[in-house]
């Protein structure tokens, strides 16, 4: 069995730990590298030290050392860090699985450009459940296009730095697309003060931050006499890690190109 040679960015973080543990448990994957910022106290330590069973892979801040033996980099960090990793990976033919959120238009354009040089999986959420939910939302939006108000409510832990979440924005894009609209034309990102009556064509967003919430997303279709709620709630980051490995398997035979989890799951 050919082994997927995978490195993890943000190796000392919560998601980094989950990815490392999942890779070490997989039969078809090998942890071959680990990256973190130079200021991290974890640099120089074994990437699996937190498990009490060293993996023989040190956490590096130098890209050349951290990625020397890897075919894939899984990155759930921050946009500025991911874009640095992206430049290196594109230049050295290393495939990327990007779960980082919060990119601006320029960042997304850089990812698309890099995909002409290497294969990239870019998705705001790697969970299989979330991506099946996206398909359900597309179907629902087409059937609740008239007379229903659409609101997207998301909740995450206190440490999350971007809002709304990338998953919530993607849900909005899917719904808007199903209605033949652009999200930026209909989105109401926040409400405060005297806002007036609701625009029936709008898609509203509400954000909650607190505690250790992994990620909850609910889309409300509110009509007269009924309301429909489609929800996904994450209880562990392991679903993101399993989805990331599934993405790596999908990319294994790809040379270049930009993909997302809808491609992996055959939901196009």
UniProtKB/Swiss-Prot annotation:
Keywords linked to the UniProt accession: Amino-acid biosynthesis, Cytoplasm, Diaminopimelate biosynthesis, Lysine biosynthesis, NAD, NADP, Oxidoreductase
What PROSITE patterns does the record tag this protein with? DAPB
The answer on whether this UniProt entry bears the keyword DNA-binding reads no
Sorted alphabetically, the Gene Ontology cellular component annotations on this record are: cytosol
Pfam families from the entry?
A: DapB_C, DapB_N
MF terms from GO for this chain are: 4-hydroxy-tetrahydrodipicolinate reductase; NAD binding; NADP binding; oxidoreductase activity, acting on CH or CH2 groups, NAD or NADP as acceptor
Enzyme class, spelled out: oxidoreductase
Q: Report the EC number(s), separated by commas if there are several.
A: 1.17.1.8
The reaction(s) annotated as catalysed by this protein in its Swiss-Prot or TrEMBL entry are: (S)-2,3,4,5-tetrahydrodipicolinate + NAD(+) + H2O = (2S,4S)-4-hydroxy-2,3,4,5-tetrahydrodipicolinate + NADH + H(+); (S)-2,3,4,5-tetrahydrodipicolinate + NADP(+) + H2O = (2S,4S)-4-hydroxy-2,3,4,5-tetrahydrodipicolinate + NADPH + H(+)
Q: Which domain of life is it from?
A: Bacteria
Quote the pathway field: Amino-acid biosynthesis; L-lysine biosynthesis via DAP pathway; (S)-tetrahydrodipicolinate from L-aspartate: step 4/4
Positions that bind NAD(+): 10-15, 36, 99-101, 123-126
Binding locations of (S)-2,3,4,5-tetrahydrodipicolinate: 157, 166-167
Functionally, this protein is described as follows: Catalyzes the conversion of 4-hydroxy-tetrahydrodipicolinate (HTPA) to tetrahydrodipicolinate.
Q: What is this protein called?
A: 4-hydroxy-tetrahydrodipicolinate reductase
Q: Which organism is it from?
A: Janthinobacterium sp. (strain Marseille)
**Organism lineage:** Bacteria, Pseudomonadati, Pseudomonadota, Betaproteobacteria, Burkholderiales
Q: Which gene encodes it?
A: dapB
């Amino acid at each position: 069995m050919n082994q997927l040679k995978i490195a993890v960015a943000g190796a000392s973080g919560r998601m980094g730990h989950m990815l490392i543990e999942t890779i070490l448990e997989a039969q078809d994957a090998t942890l071959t590298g680990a990256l973190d910022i130079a200021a991290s106290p974890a640099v120089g330590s074994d990437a699996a030290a937190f498990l009490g069973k060293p993996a023989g892979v040190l956490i590096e801040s130098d890209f050349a050392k951290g990625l020397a033996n890897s075919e894939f980099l899984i990155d759930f960090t921050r946009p500025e860090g991911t874009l640095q990793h992206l430049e290196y990976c594109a230049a050295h033919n290393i495939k990327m699985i990007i779960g980082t959120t919060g990119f601006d238009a320029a960042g997304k354009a850089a990812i698309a450009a890099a995909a002409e040089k290497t294969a990239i999986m870019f998705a705001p959420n790697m969970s299989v459940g979330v991506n099946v939910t996206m398909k359900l939302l597309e179907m629902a939006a087409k059937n609740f296009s008239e007379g229903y108000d659409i609101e997207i409510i998301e909740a995450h832990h206190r440490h999350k730095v971007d809002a709304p979440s990338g998953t919530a924005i993607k849900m909005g894009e899917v719904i808007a697309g199903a209605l033949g609209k652009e999200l930026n034309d209909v989105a109401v990102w926040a409400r405060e003060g005297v806002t007036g009556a609701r625009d029936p064509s709008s898609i509203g967003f509400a954000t909650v931050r607190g505690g250790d919430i992994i990620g909850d997303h609910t889309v409300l279709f509110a009509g007269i006499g009924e309301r429909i709620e489609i929800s996904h709630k994450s209880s562990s980051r392991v679903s993101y890690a399993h989805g990331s490995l599934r993405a790596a398997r999908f990319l294994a035979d790809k040379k270049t190109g930009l993909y997302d989890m809808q491609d992996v799951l055959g939901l196009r």
